């Protein structure tokens, strides 16, 4: 459920169905950081930034050493004007040895922020 919902979220398709799948997975496994991240990320991708923040904060609590989850939280912080916290999360994500593609994206955000 979560995998398909997250994949759809990343592709920007079937977002209503994706959210339903992810919420179902989150209800079944509320302590799974990856599923919690997916829920926060679908909220972010559908411009519900303030709603996404506490969920992504929880995801980071559950999976503190995951670069992608820290990056997602940084993005959400930026969108709700919490820029210092966003920069902190992005810098933290960089220290977790993300793959080259993610590292490059984060470095751009550190230089220019998000649009």
Tell me the role of every PLM-derived stretch:
Residues 35, 69, 102-103:
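TPR alpha-solenoid repeat register
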Residues 24-27, 58-61, 95:
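Conserved structural position within tetratricopeptide repeats
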Residues 3, 38, 72, 105-109:
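Canonical tetratricopeptide repeat
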Residues 9-10, 44, 78:
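Position-specific recognition of the canonical hydrophobic site in helix A of tetratricopeptide repeat
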């Amino acid at each position: 459920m979560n995998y398909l919902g997250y994949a759809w979220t990343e592709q920007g398709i079937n977002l209503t169905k994706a959210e339903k799948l992810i919420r179902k997975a989150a209800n079944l496994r509320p302590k799974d950081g990856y599923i919690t991240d997916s829920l926060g990320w679908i909220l972010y991708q559908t411009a519900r930034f303030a709603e996404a923040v506490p969920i992504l904060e929880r995801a980071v609590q559950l999976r503190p050493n995951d670069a992608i989850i820290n990056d997602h939280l940084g993005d959400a912080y930026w969108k709700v004007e919490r820029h210092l916290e966003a920069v902190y999360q992005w810098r933290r994500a960089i220290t977790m040895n993300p793959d080259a593609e993610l590292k490059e994206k984060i470095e751009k955000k550190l230089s220019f922020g998000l649009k």
